[in-house]
Amino acid sequence: MGKVVEISINKFSYADKIILENVNFTVEKGEAIVIAGLSGSGKTTLIRLLNGLIPQVYEGKLTGEIKILGKSTGEYKAGELAKYIGNVFQNPDDQFFSNEVENEIALVGENTGLERSVLLERVNSAMEQLDIVSLKGRKLRELSGGQKQKVAIASTLVYDSDIIILDEPTANLDFTSIEDMRRVLKKLKGQGKTIIIAEHRLFYLKDIIDRLIFLKAGHLENIFLPEDLNESIRKENMLRCFDYSELTSEAAEAGEEVLVRVNDLSVKNKSYKLDDLAEFSLAGGECMAVIGENGIGKTTMAKELMGLLPIKRGEVSYAISDRERLRYTAASLQNCRNMFFYETVEKELIPREKEADREYLDKVKKYLIHLELWDKRTMNPHDLSGGEKQRLALLISMLKKSKLVILDEPTAGLDYKRMSLVSSIIEEKAKEVPVILITHDLELLFKVCNTAYLMSEKGHRKICVTGNESEIIRFFNSKDKQ
């Protein structure tokens, strides 16, 4: 078949910090591999070395060589690798330069000088291959996360890239979009494309990949075949689960005393015109998952509960006005960058009136150490990594005295270890006040949630998690939510 990627890294470092060392492997034409490992293991750096972002965008010192299609990456001119490698980032918005779908898909072809007639033909072909013809004429900002990822992949097909590199492409996707991604990747592999994916979520890849490259602390720790990926290997290497059907509830039962009531709350939004009313109660010790497809009203409901949106209809028991709801709820938002207002992590967590409160300061220190943020405490929050920002946003909500906690996708893009750290903090908080958890992360749900609120076009309902694991998994997987 022939080698299309040859990696021989003796050492790669940023300044004096070694990031990768003794990483050597090859990728055959038409092969699909996943690069896995805990955050900080070197996955993103390796991806940047492969697609040429290092050294063209990011500086660093490489001892060794990386070859793409038999040619050292250092021999390619700036931008030339884009002819052969298609890139799909974790957040597709980071790679978009156009406002409309067709213009974005055509961009690589325009930049590489394709004739207009050929370019138009390839744009149409790419959209047909990915079943996104219906998106013609749409604005990118109007699309869902899954649709945006398909547009990003379509742009790689316009120049007929031999190699497609994806960096955590499902971190922000719901189950329906992940299944779409799985079908797209399987189709591309069937066309002979070489696929390299850096990913934490593995359940959708097991029947696609040929090998799993496992990095640990910058070293190539192991290479696994799909048949090697059993539960023992998963636990030993702290990998995300391979099969959701094997998950069972681990959460303790909620208490009996009702602390929060939500009555006849309207969650109608621009996407869904149906005005199905939300109604539920929350007891002490309860962590309730809120699940449903994107656009169904989960975030609208959360914003109403926390006072960011006015309640159009209905009432809640813990507050009357928008201002009171803001005061009595603690929240961690999906776009947590908007939650930071101070110049250091410490100042985000320690209000002026708490600076002399030794008990509070000890609690902050305990949480910072537990969430692996202690050595980041003097940094600007905006300089943290994505996962570190998520954990800081979670910690802000955990420390606030409140009557209700609302968490929106607190583990998106987190590895198994950090997901487990986050879950233990959520469990601890749920013992104090009820927690509402909006999530597409089934592993987290089964670890911490004792109830689930299922939202769909056919109505909303609340169920216990224990004993209903199969029903919840079916609900996640179903496009037509029951």
Predicted regions, residues:
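Catalytic Walker B motif of ABC-type/P-loop ATPase nucleotide-binding domains
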Residues: 164-167, 405-408
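Conserved ABC ATPase signature
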Residues: 139-143, 147, 380-384, 388
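H-loop/switch region of ABC-family ATPase nucleotide-binding domains
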Residues: 199-200, 439-440
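ABC ATPase C-loop
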Residues: 157, 397-398
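Conserved ABC ATPase "signature" region
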Residues: 117-135, 359-376
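Conserved ABC transporter NBD signature motif
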Residues: 59-72, 313-327
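Conserved beta-strand-loop-alpha-helix hinge in the C-terminal portion
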Residues: 219-241, 459-481
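Hydrophobic anchor residue at the start of the ABC signature
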Residues: 153-154, 394
